[in-house]
């Protein structure tokens, strides 16, 4: 299957020294090599094959367990691993790379909302039935989206598993969503009878503005006893 490269245990053992040699040949520093191998080992401790969905879940795992700077280091490492595999296997690999956490997302996760506060924020929103804002928090944390990009997500994009975002320079940036998050969000939409259109709308059904998202996040953080400056 294109986009999936099965990796059994023996193959992993073969690939680690080969990956190490690839990094040395590229004149990576000892610290960079060490960091890349940590990312490699962590990924394969969680998943037995390489698939886009597993890579996205890996990013979600990193976000839930590490600070933003560490998340980006691990993403860099796994992307170098994908470079290495693409060089070896060519057409058997699709050209997919994880996006790093952007400045705004890093601020949301690490400036300085603790992992404990992040988990508390999600849980309090979900337990109180405030699902719209629960999903705002989830999509911000699980993707590389800016708030201005977040508000463009529609139900149709959840069925696709991604959204194509057009930059000022005319380039397209594809933002992927983890399957589990798509499924959970689609169940939420189905429960309220929505089959299409923007995910994040106000009571009148209008798209919430980026400023509205940022402002309300701070208000909700205060209610959840979370420092508003961290969101």
Model-derived regions: residue spans:
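N-terminal core-binding DNA-recognition domain of tyrosine recombinases/integrases
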Residues: 2-4, 16-109
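Short, leucine-enriched amphipathic alpha-helices that occur as contiguous helical runs
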Residues: 36, 118, 132-134, 210, ...
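DNA breakage-rejoining catalytic core of tyrosine-based enzymes
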Residues: 104-120, 170-181, 193-196
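Basic, Lys/Arg- and aromatic-enriched nucleic-acid-binding interface segment
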Residues: 115-147, 171
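Conserved tyrosine-mediated DNA breakage-rejoining catalytic core shared by Y-recombinases
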Residues: 143, 152-187
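Active-site-proximal segment of tyrosine recombinases
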Residues: 149-150, 229-231
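Active-site/catalytic core of tyrosine-dependent DNA strand-transfer enzymes
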Residues: 178-229
